[in-house]
């Protein structure tokens, strides 16, 4: 009905009781980690958390191997956009997994899009946009107005974003 592909990102409340925390989510929406290309942009959907309400069956080493392998296969001319439930674990976008590190900026990271904090916020950190978005049904935990965020990523890797606000009053 929206005329576009919809992709999902697992959140902390999607880890529910079952065989393992993300079992129900995976049975409905598919894998919790995946990537795809559109033009010269490589999109990566990750779950870097180890669960929340219920424990994940994947460990940090699983995540590290998958992400490193995925990014190592990306053409060096492509830009990368990360989707994750929470913000980057580090302000410099260098992910540490034990003694190993993965510098996402060396893989042409241009945006990190997340939602866990339930507020609408955009900032630029050394050329990487941090884009946080609240739930569309109730606004933000910071009392921001309800709405949806549109993110446009152009063929030239330009990123623009704007909010469409609406009233929840009946």
What is each residue range found by the language model?
Residues 161-170:
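Short, solvent-exposed aromatic-acidic interface loops
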Residues 48, 83-87, 116:
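Short, well-ordered beta-to-alpha junction loops that form the rim of enzyme active sites
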Residues 1-75, 79, 98-111, 119-160:
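Extended active-site neighborhood of metal-dependent phosphoesterases/phosphodiesterases
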Residues 17, 89-93:
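Short, solvent-exposed loop/turn segments at secondary-structure junctions
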């Amino acid at each position: 009905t929206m005329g576009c592909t919809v992709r999902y990102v697992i959140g902390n409340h999607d880890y529910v009781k079952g065989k393992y925390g993300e079992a129900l989510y995976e049975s409905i929406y598919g894998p919790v980690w995946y990537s795809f290309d559109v033009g010269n942009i490589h999109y990566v959907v990750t779950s870097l958390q180890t669960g929340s309400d219920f424990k994940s069956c994947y460990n940090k080493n699983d995540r590290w191997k998958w992400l490193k392998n995925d990014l190592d296969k990306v053409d060096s001319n492509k830009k990368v956009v990360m989707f994750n439930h929470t913000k980057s674990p580090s302000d410099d976008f260098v992910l540490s997994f034990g003694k190993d590190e993965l510098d996402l900026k060396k893989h042409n990271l241009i945006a990190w899009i997340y939602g866990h904090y339930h507020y609408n916020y955009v900032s630029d950190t050394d050329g990487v946009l941090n884009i946080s978005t609240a739930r569309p049904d109730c606004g933000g935990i910071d009392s921001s107005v309800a709405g949806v965020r549109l993110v446009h990523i152009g063929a030239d890797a330009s990123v623009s974003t704007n909010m469409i606000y609406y009233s929840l009053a009946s």
